[in-house]
Amino acid sequence: MTDSEHVGKTCQIDVLIEEHDERTRAKARLSWAGRQMVGVGLARLDPADEPVAQIGDELAIARALSDLANQLFALTSSDIEASTHQPVTGLHH
């Protein structure tokens, strides 16, 4: 493929963070190839810890993105199996 044949592709990931009491929930929404996928991550404040909102946000976001990645791996595995009619054995995540 030459530079003149290069085609860029994009996807969009939006993350919504909601806090209620001492719980934080993040939703990571992936929009790509006409599909929508949503990963969810939760975090809660341990009563023994000092409340630092950023830490709860980071943990909830990381968990939401991890959930989304796992869903994308599962979708990819299904697509490979549908295409090859063989079980997928070498897909690592």
From Swiss-Prot:
Residues annotated as transmembrane: none
Organism: Mycobacterium tuberculosis (strain ATCC 25618 / H37Rv)
Protein's name according to its UniProt entry: Uncharacterized protein Rv2632c
Family that this chain belongs to: To M.tuberculosis Rv1738.
SUPFAM superfamilies registered for this protein in UniProt: Rv2632c-like
